[in-house]
């Protein structure tokens, strides 16, 4: 897997980088493992916009991914590595010995023809799924469960991996990609290795159109809106926001203000909060 760039024969191709798709071995999805996808366009069940700047984009078939890895002690052969339009990571098609087919997230370095397995007695190899209690310290894992049997919920993005740093009692301590250190129950499953397509973070859209293909609409700055639409709006010309700090369209402090509920029950499992990420836009004022 790598990236490919173009000669600057148009302004957009000067900046664009795309994946070379070298690891893809099959172009058409397994029909029995696909389903239609409801496109909410950022709306909730009442039709109100709850996630701004969503809509349009290319129609996509959803690939049914096995995040649970609950088919224990049955070997599976990696039959193909495929592109998935619903995520940055690639997916691997598995053929189990009993005839069943499933998709999983493609671990980095996993080749077609490799035999993988899940279960508490599985060998310690990339792509195998084991309980956290059976995974050695210092190991990189992905697709980590937060509740036993619920399926992997965290560390699923392209190139992501968490590290097992400690074990004590009923819990295993993981260092997540965000920098957060968190306790997870020892009987939760995780997959050995790092998620593939590690170069996804290095890709550049190059033009607005590629973002529109993905259903991402333009982001309008609050300072160019009217006062009825945003607290930063209004004024003559390029006016300052008129506040001590930037706020959301609903008046809540943003760009650094903590939003996590202090009474959230899962807070007791967080050993160290994630590191601060810079989300400031142009001039550090917009939301």
From Swiss-Prot:
> In the UniProt record, does the keyword Ribosomal protein occur?
yes
Q: Name one GO cellular component term.
A: large ribosomal subunit
Its domain of life?
Answer: Bacteria
- Which GO terms fall under biological process for this protein? translation
Keyword annotations of the record? Ribonucleoprotein, Ribosomal protein, RNA-binding, rRNA-binding
Function comment: One of the primary rRNA binding proteins. Required for association of the 30S and 50S subunits to form the 70S ribosome, for tRNA binding and peptide bond formation. It has been suggested to have peptidyltransferase activity; this is somewhat controversial. Makes several contacts with the 16S rRNA in the 70S ribosome.
Quaternary structure note = Part of the 50S ribosomal subunit. Forms a bridge to the 30S subunit in the 70S ribosome.
Instruction: Describe the family membership recorded for this protein in Swiss-Prot or TrEMBL.
Output: Belongs to the universal ribosomal protein uL2 family.
Report the protein name in the record. Answer: Large ribosomal subunit protein uL2
Species annotation: Nostoc punctiforme (strain ATCC 29133 / PCC 73102)
At the highest ranks, the source species' classification is: Bacteria, Bacillati, Cyanobacteriota, Cyanophyceae, Nostocales
């Amino acid at each position: 897997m790598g990236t490919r760039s173009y000669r600057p024969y148009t302004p957009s191709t000067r900046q664009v980088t795309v994946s070379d798709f070298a690891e893809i071995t099959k172009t058409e999805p397994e029909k029995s493992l696909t389903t239609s996808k409801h496109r909410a366009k950022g709306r909730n069940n009442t039709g109100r916009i709850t996630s701004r700047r969503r809509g349009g984009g290319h129609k996509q078939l959803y690939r049914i991914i096995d995040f649970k890895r609950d088919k224990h002690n049955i070997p599976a052969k990696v039959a193909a590595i495929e592109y998935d339009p619903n995520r940055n990571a690639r997916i691997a098609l598995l053929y189990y010995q009993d005839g069943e087919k499933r998709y999983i997230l493609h671990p980095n370095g996993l080749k077609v023809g490799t035999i993988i397995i899940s279960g508490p007695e599985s060998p310690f190899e990339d792509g195998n799924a084991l309980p956290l209690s059976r995974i050695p310290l210092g190991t990189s894992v992905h697709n980590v469960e937060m509740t036993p049997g619920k399926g992997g919920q965290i560390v699923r993005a392209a190139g992501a991996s968490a590290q097992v740093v400690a074990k004590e009692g009923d819990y295993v301590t993981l260092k997540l990609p965000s920098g957060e250190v968190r306790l997870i129950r020892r009987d939760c499953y995780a997959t050995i290795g790092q998620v593939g397509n590690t170069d996804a973070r290095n890709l550049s859209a190059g033009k607005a159109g590629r973002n529109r293909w993905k259903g991402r609409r333009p982001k309008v700055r609050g300072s160019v809106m009217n006062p009825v639409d945003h607290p930063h709006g209004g004024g003559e010309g390029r006016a300052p926001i008129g506040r001590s700090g930037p706020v959301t369209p609903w008046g809540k402090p943003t760009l650094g203000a903590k939003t996590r509920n202090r009474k959230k029950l899962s807070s007791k499992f967080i050993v160290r909060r994630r590191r601060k990420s810079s989300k400031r836009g142009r001039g550090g004022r917009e939301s």
